[in-house]
Amino acid sequence: MKKQILLTAALLSATSMMAQKLTYPQAPKDGTIDTYFGVQVADPYRPLENDSSKATAEWVAAENKVTQEYLSRIPFRGKLLNRMKELANYEKVSAPSYIKSIGKWLFYKNDGLQNQSVLYIMDSLGDEKNARVFLNPNQLSTDGTVALKGIYFSHNGKYAAYAISRSGSDWQEFYIIDVKTGKLLDDHITWAKFSGASWQGDGFYYSAYDAPQKGLEFSNVNSIQKIYYHKIGTPQSEDVLFYQNPANPMRFYAVSVNEEETMMFLHESGAGSGNNVYVRDLRQPNSQFIQMTSNLDLQYSLVETIGDKMYFLTNDGAPKNRLMVTDLKHPGFSEWKTLVPESKDMLEGVTFVDDKMILNYMKDASSHAYVYSMDGKQLSEIKLPTLGSAGFYGEKDRKEVFYSFSSFTVPTTIYQYDLNTANSKVYAAPKVKFKESDYVCEQVFYPSKDGTKIPLFITYKKGLKRNGKNPVFLYGYGGFNVPLTPYFSSVRIPFIENGGIYAQASLRGGSEYGEEWHIAGTKMQKQNVFDDFISAGEWLIENKYTSKDYLAIVGGSNGGLLVGACMTQRPDLFKVCIPQVGVMDMLRYHKFTIGWNWAPDYGTSEDSKEMFDYLHGYSPLHNLRPGTKYPATLVTTADHDDRVVPAHSFKFAATLQAVNAANTPTLIRIDTKAGHGSGKPLSKQLEEQADIYGFILYNMGLKY
């Protein structure tokens, strides 16, 4: 009886907290008005774009205080976080990768709750017990906010260059390890961005920008990317400028050299996902780059080189991709030969292994894989465990094949595949503290507003009743040729085991069905994406999975835009909205860091009157209306996000707090020493997810 009374008292206290109207900090404002094609558009919270100003810093601190006080009073938040930690505390291992130049195997492992995964090295397969730590990113900072972005071994096996990022920023720094001694050398490269390291001799090529002005490191437009060559043992100030193209400042450039160091490739990409490729024969003294392709709207991905042959995955003439081959004597695209033609499914990747090829296709947003001969004939299918996502690993001159497999209820498992017997065996299986067989995952196809069938994955616990009272976490993205496929995340389990439903929609704008599917969700067809997502919510309600009182929508980055647009267009449909690191100001997004790179998907407010009108018509920031009742909203961003600058979320949250006519919380959670999401330490991830799921359940009147 006493326990019941205490529980009732706790619920009454929680209900009282929900009824209290929150008081929000006053955001800095000015009278800024922009004019687009004769149309005046006010931007009163423009001062929040200055993320290094004292006024912005004070507002951020005050907003975080309101948010943290609210979240800390959710009675079950601690219990939820503890369960998330329990579920995340399992050993996670990557597929092993053979490094030919050193004759050893590398793999990543996380013992459970380590903030960053550790890189291990072993002499041979099966020798995992004697594996040695090669690089432990957890030792690079006390709080786990320094992340390893990549490691690159020299072709002579003497050195390894590794890239790190700090606090989630896209800026990279390179350091060098002497492989034989394990000693860290004095070499240090700064202001690299969107860069790997490609070795030639005792040095490597990398891509960087000029050092930004102090105070604008995380907001200034990135232009004129340059390629440098760094010689080991020399200071960065002596690095040789290898390539730049000031005539096209808004392009990315990178160099790659094959492992035999016989070919060099220059990769050029503009705004969007297309690219051009140039090749140079390093065996010929004073040779120059030869242009292979000339269409920045299409993709040409170099997959492998074998002798003088070059293999490319491309959507040129094949919206769902095809595999093509050419050689140094016939580099121009018009002379390329189709090795594997386009099929009805999306070709995602090709792995060369032991005189064979493994082609990984996507069918209805799930992986299907096949073994091919080198002359392009299909030999067999690789049987995968269930609907899910697979990634393949192998080397052209070795027999070993590994693949990772994951689905909504299947934690990432590593398999070793035998090409001779066509059998898979488990190489590394995680042990998560939940019972996989207790859950159901189904895929349905629902009609969008225009009748297009959209794939929707729905995951829930067995025995769930479709009575319209189940909480739903509806997730989407819909853009930039990025597919949403099945994957495991332990933080969802507490929600699902408590009677929740996780729903994931594969919206237009992604690559689930090729380039046509992508284009159907871009520029002046972007509304299709929002219609797809809104229709998913309506379908779930119509089919009694949930109701408006239990429907939450969540999305990050372009998915944050998705949530922002849908909640402004249909505020009546959702109970809770979580726009994460979203693009909220569609009129000014291209004026920050690499926002210009998104123009092929979005268009810009300067393109034309028609494009401005279209963007203005759905831009989340510009479609918040005074007097409208909006759902409970938790906006998330981070102080070091230099991909989608936090000003988007700052201005959106400040405006929503000012106009919302409903007595619903409008909070913004601003993470510190964090960025767009990549490299975020596990401890920060779990804290954030406990806040998000706690906020959702609490504002639905539910508990955990």
Each model region followed by its residue ranges:
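Non-catalytic accessory segments flanking enzyme active sites
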Residues: 54-152, 163, 251-305, 338, ...
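Hydrophobic beta-strand positions that form the internal "hydrophobic ladder"
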Residues: 105, 157-160, 204-205, 264, ...
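A flexible loop/linker signature enriched in serine peptidases of the S9 family
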Residues: 110-117, 141-145, 164-173, 188-192, ...
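Bacterial Sec-dependent N-terminal signal peptides
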Residues: 1-21
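A conserved hydrophobic secondary-structure block that centers on an alpha-helix together
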Residues: 129-196
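Cap/lid segment of the alpha/beta-hydrolase catalytic domain
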Residues: 138-151, 163-169, 183, 417-423, ...
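Active-site-proximal cap/loop segments of hydrolase catalytic domains
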Residues: 504-704
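Beta-propeller blade signature
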Residues: 121-124, 175-179, 221-233, 278-282, ...
